Amino acid sequence: MASSIMALSSTAAVAAVAAPSKTGNSNVVSAFTGLKSMAQFPSSKTMSNAGAEWEQKTTSNGSRVRCMQVWPPYANKKFETLSYLPRLTPEQLVKEVEYLLKNKWVPCLEFEEDGEIKRVYGNSPGYYDGRYWVMWKLPMFGCTEASQVLNEVNECAKAYPNAFIRVIGFDNVRQVQCISFIVHKPEYN
């Protein structure tokens, strides 16, 4: 009995799905045309006072969507946290490294002459795709002063003047990289 009811209900469902629509092609979705402006929503004249207050407090970028631009990726290398800013002064570098040490992160230096992510040896991401830079010496376990880190930065910059140098802060308890920022750029960049 139950199986015959199941058979009847399943054939009815298939028939309903297979039946053509009388209004034409009603299941076609229109193409995405971007964000809409607030003009098609009800105006504050028809809304209550609470709705008008809410409308005044909110913002919409609907009218500005066509003004958005993409950051130019060519001849404009941007890397880590502070790379969009001008070069950091020595005082700013000291503050960044002190912040790293205050959080008990282990500083480490890495350098790379090209600095671009490139996949030369295959299409899949891996060790040789440019994300992993060469480590300068060993991570500075037990480092307590920013001057120690900056001395290593200066040594690395003397040895490799045409390289990008970044400081990385590792949390050895959680075993993750917590901070990374460029401390030296080649003169041509």
From Swiss-Prot:
SUPFAM superfamilies: RuBisCO, small subunit. GO terms for biological process: photorespiration; reductive pentose-phosphate cycle. The basic functional RuBisCO is composed of a large chain homodimer in a 'head-to-tail' conformation. In form I RuBisCO this homodimer is arranged in a barrel-like tetramer with the small subunits forming a tetrameric 'cap' on each end of the 'barrel'. SMART domains: RuBisCO_small. GO terms for molecular function: ribulose-bisphosphate carboxylase activity. CDD domains: RuBisCO_small. It comes from the Eukaryota. PANTHER family: RIBULOSE BISPHOSPHATE CARBOXYLASE SMALL CHAIN 1, CHLOROPLASTIC, RIBULOSE BISPHOSPHATE CARBOXYLASE SMALL SUBUNIT 1A, CHLOROPLASTIC-RELATED. HAMAP family: RuBisCO_S_bact. It is found in: Plastid, Chloroplast. The keyword Magnesium does not apply. GO terms for cellular component: chloroplast. Pfam families: RuBisCO_small (PF00101). RuBisCO catalyzes two reactions: the carboxylation of D-ribulose 1,5-bisphosphate, the primary event in carbon dioxide fixation, as well as the oxidative fragmentation of the pentose substrate. Both reactions occur simultaneously and in competition at the same active site. Although the small subunit is not catalytic it is essential for maximal activity. It comes from Larix laricina. Its main location: plastid. This is Ribulose bisphosphate carboxylase small subunit, chloroplastic.
